[in-house]
């Protein structure tokens, strides 16, 4: 409920770390009343907080958009690049001014398709004045075990494709399980080490 946002801001809004809002409803297509939901909730969050930025993190209805309860790792009925562009053009037109940042999840399409979707997403976001970030998933959708930490080379590839498409900001899902040294997955700590080594090469 929207009123919950007002209650949260009254209790927590004075903290310096309260820098904005994440609207947690995820979608991949222009279905139902998703535009109305994003627009109304985004405007309400900004209204009660003095204009703090709002973010959404949708996904792409690609071949890897498979339920975690399904042993399969891919599907056949997927969105085309053209349909994706058309539907998200309409969504962005409807949420302009209510949503400030869009961070598409990067794990639902094949690696050789990803850069094209990244470029389309950024082109549309630029058109409507939204910031376009990438949400780089740190778990592996290519394995029948749902889910294990992603191999470093795959994560590095996705980050490189985002940079190639002109992205400057990234978030991840999900650090605590798949990348934290404190995770129960031993691979997560190794992924963290590889990432920190990579950051040192940028200094």
For every predicted segment, state its role:
Residues 103-111, 131-203:
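Substrate-binding cleft of secreted/luminal carbohydrate-active enzymes
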Residues 7, 36-47, 90, 116-123, ...:
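Alpha-helical scaffolding segments of alpha/beta enzyme cores, especially the outer helices
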Residues 1, 22-26, 41-84, 101-107, ...:
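Aromatic-lined carbohydrate-recognition surfaces of secreted/lumenal glycan-active proteins
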Residues 2-9:
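Short, small-residue-biased leader/transition segments that mark boundaries at the very start
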Residues 1, 32-37, 76-87, 112-113, ...:
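Alpha-helix N-cap and loop-to-helix initiation/capping positions
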């Amino acid at each position: 409920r929207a009123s919950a946002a007002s209650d949260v801001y009254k209790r927590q809004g004075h903290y310096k770390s309260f820098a904005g809002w994440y609207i947690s409803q995820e979608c991949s297509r222009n279905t139902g009343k998703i535009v109305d939901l994003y627009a109304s909730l985004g405007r309400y969050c900004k209204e009660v907080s003095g204009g703090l930025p709002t973010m959404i993190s949708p996904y792409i209805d690609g071949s890897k958009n498979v339920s975690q309860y399904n042993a399969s790792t891919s599907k056949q009925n997927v969105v085309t690049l053209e349909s994706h562009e058309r539907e998200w053009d309409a969504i962005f037109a409807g949420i302009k001014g209510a949503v400030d940042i869009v961070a598409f999840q990067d794990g639902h399409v094949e690696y050789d398709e990803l850069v094209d979707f990244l470029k389309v997403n950024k082109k549309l976001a630029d058109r409507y004045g939204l910031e376009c970030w990438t949400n780089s998933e740190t778990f592996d959708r290519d394995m029948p075990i749902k889910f294990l930490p992603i191999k470093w080379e795959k994560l590095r590839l996705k980050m490189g494709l985002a940079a190639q498409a002109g992205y400057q900001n990234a978030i991840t899902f999900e650090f605590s399980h798949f990348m934290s040294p404190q995770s129960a997955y031993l691979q997560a700590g190794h992924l963290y080490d590889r990432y920190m080594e990579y950051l040192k090469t940028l200094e």
